[in-house]
């Protein structure tokens, strides 16, 4: 019976150690992702695309050190983070929007960027006209 209990104890220690390593890997991946997003925010127009790539690469590096089902979750979080950073970059005018008007899934993209005129010669962006906007008055 002692041998059986000792074996279970060692197995429990192994599971605890594996869980701690996974937790540490996820925490490191989150930290690297945060660093990458902050890096994107600090870059100028020319550096944004490189910054988004850096976020993806740093997250991918950390994900490879994490095992099992956690990888799927971290990858999904990293993908959403990179998509969000790209959307922020496009919304602030740092990068040009895809002229096809389609997202990766093939669905039409909607939003204010569709109406934004682009001058490809000097990459200048103009604010869309205020036609179609309604004044918002909050209720008291």
Curated annotation (Swiss-Prot):
Keywords linked to the UniProt accession: Acetylation, Cell projection, Copper, Cytoplasm, Membrane, Metal-binding, Nucleus, Phosphoprotein, Repeat, Secreted, Synapse, Ubl conjugation
Modified sites of kind N-acetylmethionine: 1
Residue numbers of Phosphotyrosine PTMs: 125
Biased composition (Acidic residues): 112-140
PTM entry text: Phosphorylated, predominantly on serine residues. Phosphorylated on Tyr-125 upon osmotic stress. Ubiquitinated. The predominant conjugate is the diubiquitinated form.
SUPFAM superfamilies, sorted: Synuclein
Listed GO biological process terms: chemical synaptic transmission; regulation of dopamine secretion; synapse organization; synaptic vesicle endocytosis
Subcellular location(s) per record: Cytoplasm, Cytosol; Membrane; Nucleus; Synapse
Cellular component, GO annotation: axon terminus; cytosol; extracellular space; membrane; neuronal cell body; nucleus
Cell cycle keyword on record: no
Pfam family, one: Synuclein
Chain segments carrying region Interaction with SERF1A: 111-140
UniProt keyword Oxidoreductase, yes or no: no
Residues binding Cu cation, per UniProt: 2, 50
Region spans: Disordered: 97-140
Highest rank taxon of the organism: Eukaryota
Post-translational modification Phosphoserine, affected residues: 129
InterPro entries: Synuclein (IPR001058), Synuclein_alpha (IPR002460)
GO MF assignments: copper ion binding; cuprous ion binding; identical protein binding
Family under the similarity heading: Belongs to the synuclein family.
Function per UniProt: Neuronal protein that plays several roles in synaptic activity such as regulation of synaptic vesicle trafficking and subsequent neurotransmitter release. Participates as a monomer in synaptic vesicle exocytosis by enhancing vesicle priming, fusion and dilation of exocytotic fusion pores. Mechanistically, acts by increasing local Ca(2+) release from microdomains which is essential for the enhancement of ATP-induced exocytosis.
Self-association and partners: Soluble monomer. Homotetramer. A dynamic intracellular population of tetramers and monomers coexists normally and the tetramer plays an essential role in maintaining homeostasis. Interacts with UCHL1. Interacts with phospholipase D and histones. Interacts (via N-terminus) with synphilin-1/SNCAIP; this interaction promotes formation of SNCA inclusions in the cytoplasm. Interacts with CALM1. Interacts with STXBP1; this interaction controls SNCA self-replicating aggregation. Interacts with SNARE components VAMP2 and SNAP25; these interactions allows SNARE complex assembly and integrity.
PANTHER family for the chain: ALPHA-SYNUCLEIN (PTHR13820:SF5), SYNUCLEIN (PTHR13820)
Protein name: Alpha-synuclein
Protein source organism: Ateles geoffroyi (Black-handed spider monkey)
Gene: SNCA
């Amino acid at each position: 019976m002692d041998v059986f209990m000792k074996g279970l104890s060692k197995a429990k220690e192994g599971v605890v150690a594996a869980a701690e390593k996974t937790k540490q890997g996820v925490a490191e991946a989150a930290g690297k992702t945060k660093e990458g997003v902050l890096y994107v925010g600090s870059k100028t127009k020319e550096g944004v695309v490189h910054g988004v790539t850096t976020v993806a690469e740093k997250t991918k590096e950390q994900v490879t050190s994490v095992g099992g089902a956690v990888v799927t979750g971290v990858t999904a979080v990293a993908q959403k983070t990179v998509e969000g950073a790209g959307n922020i970059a496009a919304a602030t005018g740092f990068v040009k929007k895809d002229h096809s008007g389609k997202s990766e899934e093939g669905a039409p993209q909607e939003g204010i960027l569709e109406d934004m005129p682009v001058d490809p010669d000097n990459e200048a962006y103009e604010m869309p006209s205020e036609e179609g906007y309604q004044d918002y008055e909050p209720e008291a």
